[in-house]
């Protein structure tokens, strides 16, 4: 896909987190292939009910236990595991900011990612962008 003026696009901001992976079908691969980084907003799924489902998910908890981190740090590490993704998590305290900062050094293993993929599968077809 050719996009006129794409050389002027320095970054694209989209909703992206473990429970909202629609952009991984075609948008994120196109962006990666064209040198357009993703700025992921809501990487911690700060949308109440959805966030609760993610942090309580057994796969997320297993990965957290494996690394000795919190489920929220797993969510942020997932968003950051692609080198072309930056994240803008909302933080309401110094403690949250520090936990988020530590997440940048967490390296999820291929087993971790496979476990998360099983629990939250990649899209198999184009889906509308989520609007949480």
Regions found by a protein language model. Name each.
Residues 1-132:
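Beta/alpha (TIM)-barrel catalytic core signal, keyed to glycine-rich beta->alpha loops juxtaposed to Asp/Glu
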């Amino acid at each position: 896909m050719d996009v006129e003026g794409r050389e002027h696009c320095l970054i694209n901001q989209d909703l992206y987190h473990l429970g909202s992976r629609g952009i991984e079908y075609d948008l994120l691969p196109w962006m990666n292939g064209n040198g357009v980084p993703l700025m992921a907003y809501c990487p911690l799924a700060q949308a109440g009910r959805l966030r609760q489902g993610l942090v309580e998910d057994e796969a997320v908890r297993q990965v957290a236990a494996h690394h000795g981190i919190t489920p929220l740090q797993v969510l942020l590490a997932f968003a950051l595991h692609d080198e072309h993704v930056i994240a803008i998590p909302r933080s309401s305290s110094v403690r949250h900011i520090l936990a988020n900062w530590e997440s940048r050094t967490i390296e999820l293993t291929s087993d971790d990612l496979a476990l998360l993929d099983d629990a939250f599968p990649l899209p198999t077809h184009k889906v509308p962008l989520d609007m949480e």
